[in-house]
Amino acid sequence: MTYEKKAPFRANHVGSLLRPPELRQAREKREQGELSAAALREIEDRCIRDAVKMQEDVGMQGITDGEFRRTLWHADFLRQIEGVKVVEGLSPDSAKRFQNPDADVQRSPTQFVVTGKLHHAHGIEVDNFKFLASVTRQTPKQCIPSPSLVHFRSGRGGVDKTAYPEMSDFFADLAAVFRQEIAQLAAAGCTYLEIDDVNFAYLCDPKMREGVRKIGEDPDKLPALYASLINECIKDRPPDMAV
């Protein structure tokens, strides 16, 4: 059997791996002020090296860092966009119970609001990608959350009308932020980018569709809107970058 030399590969994985106990405990200590940022980074580095080895040992060609740098798969990225604010616990009715052994983990979805003009202040995942690339022999795959997540749970009501009287300007600036991040990742050597978007699946769920209507959005129109937004984000990617 021949194997692809260039992404996308026949066998792929999302790449968000279960955090090892050492990393979970270290993050808890960091949140409680008992561990420095530098010490946490060292533990993350070690756990990422182990995750990379595991993926390589089973024959994966596209290697991720397990998203071990993040507390939440999307919020840690999106909160670094200037003008975006993370708000948690706004929808108790939509709280989800996660299936841990005791079934006692429940949390409301994270929402995002736009408080001012959007700006890409710095490379968000660039340094993380560079570390991953330095510790794998295979193709490093970088995952970023979809831009649609900034809009999905809050809609027009979550976008400051002084900053953005017109939603078209908001979406244009949001796409520009992602283009800048993607350009910096490309400059760092990224040739395999994954954009994680759960909202297309959510829009197949009747309850989620009703929630979209409650915030004044049309669930039948959002798929095309979000597809156009993502296409705007990736339109300037280099020819050798697979998305």
Residue ranges and their predicted role:
Residues M1-V243:
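Domain-level signal for soluble alpha/beta catalytic cores
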